[in-house]
């Protein structure tokens, strides 16, 4: 049975125990297992950086099959190129902690531990683990510098930077590893995430293609589907995502693939299909909380509000991701429960403060919240800083354009709202924002087209904004008899 993300792999009495503390206490391993684990550290350090436990094939079979157990399953998942379950990831953390306690100069083991901390922190929305990850990776590099071959730790630092949304630093680490090992695939997941975060979609596409040629398998199929989605190639994204699901070999891998199918169905405006995919992911891995959040979103679109609220409350209690807290607050607000909405918005501010203190950049979610529920000028300041620091993704462009409009600077905002859609991504919220901005500028024809696009793409894209999109479209009236307006 998989552990849920809220399960802390450290003793609860001490949020940040010494790195040598043993969270999960496996029985003392036999000598052959101990030696094999030492060798495994060198492999795992190179392959944990993709956000899941993955490994290149090994030409030599281990001398003996280890006894079944969570650490062995995590290692088997790595050998099979699959993500590990959270319970097995927890066990791996405990195992590596115990190992480095008696082998403090084992650089690969520290790199494995650091990357496992990053993975846990990302999947549990617990930024405290990013601090642990950084310390472990520093220990790895102190034992063996990157210039002396420890590129595994460099790549892991890139994955950590991505987890903190520091895409400039992630790009630096990924490109450094690629320059030293151009035929190794381990740098490419780091680079794909970094380039996407910076809005350099051409470089992200090239990195995705190279990753596919070097790595292949379900991980590459998933990345390729994500690339097609970002380009607006829905049919290709769906076909590739389905292929990934069909070839998934472990429950964790299958749940990730089904979640991707759910996200694609949601973006197509098919909440019933999205619900089916999210529930399939949850049947496969009941601790897959991102799919529980997806199910909540789909249930709300299907007017099953009480069930949606229950799911959101479960998710936000176990996975304190600011995005889901914002979604819950907006669902309360759309339901006329303003007091409950304010409670969630207060919780959101607390989470944003905690993330900032831990070095995690959550300014995108913060700007979205401030633009619609707080201080639009503060949202503008946040997004202008992102833009100035070269984080120019479609998400940032959309948020900046909308914040400028909400702050009364509509003429400045339109160029950013347009840029958000230039990547080709089909996003109802982006189209809605641009439509409202164009309407405010008196561009009724383009505005009508954008609002129709938003509602055609996903008529239930937001419990708050979708009804506003319908009202805005109705207020524009019918188009002129000359024909439909051209959508830029």
Regions found by a protein language model. Give the residues of each.
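Short coil turns that delineate tetratricopeptide repeat
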Residues: 104, 145-148, 182, 215-216, ...
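N-terminal leader/linker segments that initiate helical-solenoid repeat arrays
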Residues: 3-145, 149, 459-460, 467, ...
């Amino acid at each position: 049975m998989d552990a849920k993300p809220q399960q802390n792999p450290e003793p609860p009495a001490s949020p940040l125990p010494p790195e040598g503390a043993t969270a999960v206490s496996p029985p003392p391993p036999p000598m052959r297992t101990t030696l094999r684990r030492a060798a495994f550290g060198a492999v795992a350090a190179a392959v944990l950086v993709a956000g899941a436990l993955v490994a290149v094939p090994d030409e030599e079979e281990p001398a003996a099959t280890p006894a079944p157990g969570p650490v062995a399953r995590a290692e088997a998942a790595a050998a099979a190129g699959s993500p590990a379950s959270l319970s097995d990831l927890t066990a791996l953390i405990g195992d590596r902690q115990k190992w480095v306690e008696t082998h403090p100069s084992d650089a690969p083991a520290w790199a494995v531990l650091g990357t496992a901390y990053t993975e846990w922190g990302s999947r549990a929305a617990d930024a405290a683990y990013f601090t642990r990850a950084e310390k472990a990776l520093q220990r790895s590099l102190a034992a063996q510098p990157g210039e002396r071959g420890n590129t595994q730790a460099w790549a892991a630092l890139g994955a950590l930077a991505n987890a903190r949304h520091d895409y400039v630093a992630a790009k630096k680490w990924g490109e450094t590893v690629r320059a030293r090992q151009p035929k190794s695939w381990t740098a490419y997941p780091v680079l794909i995430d970094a380039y996407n975060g910076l809005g350099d979609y051409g470089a992200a596409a090239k990195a995705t293609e190279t990753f596919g040629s070097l790595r292949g398998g379900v991980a590459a199929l998933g990345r390729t589907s994500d690339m097609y989605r970002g380009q607006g190639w829905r049919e290709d994204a769906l076909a590739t995502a389905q292929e990934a699901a069909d070839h998934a070999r472990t429950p964790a891998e299958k749940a990730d693939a089904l979640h991707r199918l759910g996200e694609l169905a949601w973006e197509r405006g098919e909440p019933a299909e999205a619900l089916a995919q999210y529930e399939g992911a949850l049947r496969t891995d009941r601790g897959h909380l991102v799919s529980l959040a997806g199910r909540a979103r789909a249930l709300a679109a299907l007017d099953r509000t009480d069930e949606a609220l229950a799911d959101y409350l479960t998710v936000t209690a176990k996975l304190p991701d600011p995005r889901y807290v914002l979604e819950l607050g907006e669902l309360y607000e759309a339901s006329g429960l303003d007091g409950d909405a304010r409670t969630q918005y207060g919780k959101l501010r607390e989470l944003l403060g905690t993330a900032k203190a831990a070095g995690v950049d959550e300014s995108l979610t913060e700007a979205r919240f401030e633009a619609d529920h707080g201080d639009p000028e503060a949202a503008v300041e946040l997004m202008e800083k992102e833009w100035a620091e070269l984080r120019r993704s479609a998400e940032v462009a959309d948020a900046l354009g909308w914040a400028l409009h909400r702050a009364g600077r509509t003429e400045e905002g339109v160029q950013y709202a347009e840029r958000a859609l230039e990547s080709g991504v089909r996003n109802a919220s982006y189209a809605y924002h641009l439509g409202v901005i164009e309407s405010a500028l008196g561009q009724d024809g383009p505005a009508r087209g954008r609002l129709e696009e938003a509602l055609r793409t996903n008529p239930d894209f937001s419990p708050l904004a979708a009804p506003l999109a319908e009202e805005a479209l109705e207020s524009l009236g019918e188009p002129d008899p000359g024909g439909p307006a051209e959508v830029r």
